[in-house]
Amino acid sequence: MAYLYVVEDDKNISEIESFALKNAGHTVVECASGKEFHKLMRDRIPDMILLDVMLPDEDGLEILRKIRQTPETRRVPVIMVTAKTTELDKVKGLDLGADDYITKPFNPLEVIANINAILRRTNLNNQTKEIVI
């Protein structure tokens, strides 16, 4: 399955996400700050990132912007996970390049389904590129 980063400062939310993802067969690495996330990204680029918008040391939307501006990471799927529920917040995240935007509280089964759908599309795109080349 996939190698995922869960970037979430709320330990309870992080544990729920990680538990559900691990039970679905994914490998999960958790971190609680932008600083930790950037360190992880230097070590390994994941298959997908679940990213909280409101982190203690850095805005998740700014992290998303950096991910999309970096050639090595611009195609990594990112799901924003946040308590911000206004349409404007969702539109901003999606406009910056988020692949999905999930609001808290969330249903873990729905999150897993969204992740699997995005990973299927990502894998299909990768297979298509291999065939074309």
Ranges and model annotations:
Residues 52, 82:
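Active-site residues of response regulator receiver
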Residues 14, 56, 74, 86, ...:
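The feature encodes the CheY-like receiver
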Residues 8:
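Conserved acidic carboxylate
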